[in-house]
Design a protein with these regions (language model features):
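C-terminal halves and exits of single transmembrane alpha-helices
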Residues: 99-117, 188-200
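Terminal transmembrane helical anchor/hairpin motif
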Residues: 38-54, 175-253
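Aromatic- and glycine-rich beta-strand/loop motifs that create alpha-glucan
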Residues: 1-28, 252
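Transmembrane alpha-helix boundary/hinge residues in polytopic small-molecule transporters
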Residues: 86-87, 161-162, 178
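Secretory targeting signals
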Residues: 21-77, 103-175
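Short helix-to-coil transition segments within interhelical loops
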Residues: 90-98
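Juxtamembrane/interfacial segments around transmembrane helices
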Residues: 69-81, 117-118, 153-168, 195-212, ...
Length: 253
């Protein structure tokens, strides 16, 4: 257990201190504020921008998607980089079990992704609360933020981190990038509507309807919400689990 925690700590700390992480964070945050800043022009352009819940919803579904796309590239190199630098051989020379190594990588990647996404949502919501040219009760910002973290950020982080870390450990990383580009491309092309969203939406699926729902739409399709959650969490756990079954991955195989 101690060795697995050491790997989790290393993965989390190493990724968190990367300049690339904060470069991605900064770029996406700037674009988020340009797009959603409660200025007169943006308030006129976005009908519901005066609602904190809509701001959190939009930040999570649109800008959070771009953030996840950037973090995907940083996460995808974890196993290939260990092979390339010889770190995996070094770790295998110690009394470290396969499951400790894999779990450490996966959990470290998840905690890193979830932390960055939570910081992103909290920071942008705080800016919105401070600069909005109209009074906002603190609870009106806090409640949708907590909802976004629990019902959206958690399953999204689980899906993106486990898939991005695990799949390049099983297949050629270029093939992973191809699959990821197709999925992210389909997600980027989707335009929301009153109808149920496809279950494979990453940040703009029906789980986000817990955060905010367009008052002009009536939506009661709980099945699509469950399908979206099952896809995100189920896919992440399945792909993460498959890595444990891969043969010739560890010294004893």
């Amino acid at each position: 257990m101690r060795k697995m925690i050491a790997i989790i700590h290393y993965e989390y700390k190493m990724q968190f201190k990367k300049l690339a992480t904060w470069g991605v964070f900064l770029v996406v945050t700037v674009f988020t504020l340009l797009d959603n800043y409660p200025s007169a022009s943006n308030l006129a352009r976005l009908e519901f921008l005066n609602e904190p819940a809509y701001f959190v919803y939009r930040t999570m579904s649109l800008n959070g998607f771009v953030l996840m796309f950037g973090l995907m590239f940083l996460l995808s190199e974890r196993f290939p980089l260990d092979n390339k630098t010889g770190m995996k051989l070094l770790l295998m020379s110690h009394a470290l079990q396969k499951k400790q190594y894999i779990l450490g990588k996966l959990l470290g990647g998840f905690l890193y992704t979830f932390s960055i996404l939570c910081i992103f949502l909290a920071f942008n919501t705080a800016v919105y609360f401070v600069v909005a040219p109209f009074p906002i009760p603190l609870l009106e910002c806090t409640v949708p933020l907590v909802k976004a973290i629990i019902v959206s950020a958690f399953p999204v982080s689980l899906f993106v981190s486990l898939c991005s870390v695990a799949l390049p450990g099983m297949i050629d990383i270029r093939l992973f990038y191809l699959f990821a580009a197709i999925l992210f491309g389909i997600n980027a092309a989707y335009v929301g509507s009153a109808n149920a969203a496809p279950f494979y939406m990453i940040t703009s699926g029906d789980l986000t309807r817990f955060i905010w729902v367009n008052p002009k739409w009536s939506f009661n399709d709980t099945e699509s919400i469950l399908a979206n959650g099952a896809f995100l969490m189920g896919s992440g756990l399945v792909f993460g689990g498959l890595l444990f079954l891969r043969h010739r991955f560890w010294r004893s195989e």
